[in-house]
Amino acid sequence: MIYSTSTYNHDLGSKDSYFDSDGNRTGSGTHGYALHYSVPFGNWQIAFNRNHYRYHQAIAGYNENYDYSGNSDNTDLGLTRMLYRNSHRKIDVTAKVWKRESHNFINDAEIEVQQRHTAGWAVNLNHQEYIGNAVVNLGLGYKRGTGADNSLRAPEEEFGEGTSRMKIITVDAGLLWPFTLGNQQLSYDSSFHGQWNKTPLITQDQLSIGGRYTVRGFDGEVTLMGERGWYWNNNLNWQYKGRHQVYLGLDVGHVSGPSTEMQLGKTLAGAVIGFKGQIKAGGQWYYDIFAGKPIYKPQYFRTDRTNVGFSLNYSM
């Protein structure tokens, strides 16, 4: 699997991103764009996000892989309020309304019962704490689906296997700890994401692991999905020259819930090595080049032995 991402940061808090990934075996991949615009005012900030993507993904089954493809549009408008801030900590809360539309296909034939038009609201509480040289981030979120904007009810509701009125709780935690070893500048960063469901979930609301943004080392063509789950990312970084670093990463993830019973397994682990840094040339360029491989996967779970990718971001 080869990944690529490019991002352009404008003035006035706007950011446009374009991403692309292509699979080596099945033609699986993701292509799309993301737009972000934000405006701060006092202790408040308003933000608008929209992303569109087309994807092809193979889901692991007992006897064969299913080519699951589609397109999706996600839009949200949020308002953030700074609740507390001093030299050691920062606490803020964000409330947003969101809308999602999607169409899905199997072997290029649209799955009519999987047409989605859902909307709702979400709230997130975030806490950032400075402890010596380390920075700790904690987040708690709740997402609720409603009948707003002429939402369509999920066909799975008739069988108790999903709903457009989902209730999802998320937990996030992160750590950045810079330190020195001799005269070498090192740092350790770690992030955790967990999801719990209070209602049955359709596929689009389930947690998927195995790819660049969840458990690295996997090509993302085949994933594991579940109503509940978590993944944990870890990096050891060495600043070998100026603003340039080499890093080693280790990730693990696990999913559970009724939908996982027909999958090959529930746990993945992978490793990655990469180079990242900044270059000043008519603005700031940020690059990340990496290669990863699986460490643990279920038997018969198909993925490339090695996966490479890069991202390039520009900021004025």
What are these regions (language model features)?
Residues 6-23, 61-67, 105-113, 154-162, ...:
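Extracellular loop and loop/strand-boundary signature of outer-membrane beta-barrel proteins
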Residues 36-40, 107, 112, 302-313:
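Short, electropositive alpha-helical surface patch
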